[in-house]
Regions:
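Short, surface-exposed secondary-structure boundary micro-motifs
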Residues: 48, 102-103, 346
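Short flanking/linker segments adjacent to small metal-binding domains or redox-active Cys/His motifs
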Residues: 173-174, 182-185, 337-349
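Low-complexity, intrinsically disordered Gly/Pro/Thr-rich segments
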Residues: 8, 227, 318-331
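C-terminal accessory/binding modules appended to enzymatic or scaffolding proteins
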Residues: 257-291
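Local cysteine-cluster metal-coordination motifs and their immediate loop/turn environment
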Residues: 288-310, 323-338
Length: 349
């Protein structure tokens, strides 16, 4: 979608853990755009600056739909002076925020037909479970079946946990939802809803046998718990999201810079490649069109094929071992290392 939607901030409020919730109204958006706004999905904020004034594109989770054109996003202040921090500092009621498109990989429809669902989230990754839980609560209030949900959260300190009152109320007033917070950097006594440290294997056993597991957090968090869940619940349907992009390779300050090129199998043309950037970033730098969305190895939109060459990749969340064996890769997770790396942009599944 190329149309830019000018969304108006209707209101905002602060949550714990340096999070601010913004309610945005997609003024003038057509039905096609509005139908893509889904709780648990993402919306693309386009051409919004960071503190250096450089326009950026960022994705934020939709945590609630209030009206067909009014939705909420939750944004965490990071202290890195990026787009999120700039939103915190500059957006007020009436501010205009440009949106490009919205998309969803996990929605309430993905999980509502299971008997039991487990959710694990770290930090701002709580936004995905919150969106899904709110939708399930709405279904439950209307008399519809919802799965039994267990939510495990990881936060450094008790004071960092957002939406805590809402979660407690839901736990104490329904028979289908329960949650537990694991506090990793504060000395606390264990009780019903709070445990010190990270979730142990015994904690995962308390999830019983979920039909589906939702994981959302940093890339490290999502990768770790994806592996643990796959090992413990091999039959469960897994939905994993990460809110941090793949890390670029770290080079020694004394290392000689390496040169690389990307060769295009379809045309035989080539471009110089920066080995500190992903293939996706290199293509964008050279104005070569490629479909992309999440930039985190989740959606699979930037799939391509690696024909040959020296490259490395960060773990993704959507390719199978068979895909990788057939040379498929995600441009956002793959980094050229040296020499010529031949790629086919129009990969077939």
């Amino acid at each position: 979608m190329n149309q830019i939607i000018q969304a108006r901030c209707e209101y905002m409020h602060a949550e714990a853990g340096g999070i601010k919730v913004f309610a945005l109204r997609a003024n003038g958006a057509d039905t096609g755009f509005l139908n893509t706004l889904q709780p648990g999905g993402h919306v693309s904020i386009i051409r919004y600056p960071d503190f250096s004034g450089s326009p950026q594109q960022r994705f934020y989770s939709i945590t609630r739909m209030n009206e067909p054109d009014l939705f909420e996003i939750a944004v965490k202040r990071t202290g890195h002076r990026g787009v999120s921090d700039y939103l915190h500092s500059t957006v007020k009621e009436g501010s205009i925020i440009p949106l490009q498109y919205a998309a969803s990989t996990v929605t309430v429809a993905s999980i509502s037909n299971f008997q039991r669902v487990a959710m694990l989230a770290g930090g701002i990754g709580v936004t995905l479970p919150m969106a899904l839980i709110r939708e399930l609560a709405s279904l439950s209030r209307s008399g519809k079946h919802v799965p039994a949900v267990t939510l495990l959260l990881c936060f450094p300190r008790v004071a960092d946990v957002p939406f805590l009152h809402e979660l407690l109320e839901l736990d104490l007033t329904t028979d289908w939802f329960t949650f537990r917070v694991f506090v990793t950097r504060e000395d606390i006594q264990a009780c019903t809803h709070f445990q010190p440290g990270r979730p142990s294997d015994q904690s995962l056993e308390a999830l019983q046998q979920p039909g589906a597991v939702v994981i959302c957090g940093s890339r490290t968090f999502a990768h770790e718990f994806r592996q643990r869940v796959n090992h413990r619940f091999p039959g469960a349907r897994l939905f994993a999201e990460s809110f941090t992009p793949p890390s670029s390779p770290r080079e020694s300050p004394l290392a000689s810079p390496t040169s690389a090129r990307l060769l295009f199998a379809e045309t035989g043309c080539a471009i110089e490649a920066d080995t500190s950037k992903s293939i996706l970033e290199n293509l964008e730098t050279n104005n070569i069109p490629i479909r992309s969305q999440c930039r985190s190895g989740i959606c699979g939109a930037c799939r391509l094929r690696i024909i040959s060459g020296n490259y490395r990749f960060e773990p993704d969340f959507c390719l199978s071992e068979e895909d990788r064996a057939n040379g498929h890769a995600l441009a956002c997770c793959t980094f050229p290392m040296s020499g010529d790396v031949t790629i086919a942009l129009h990969a077939t599944r």
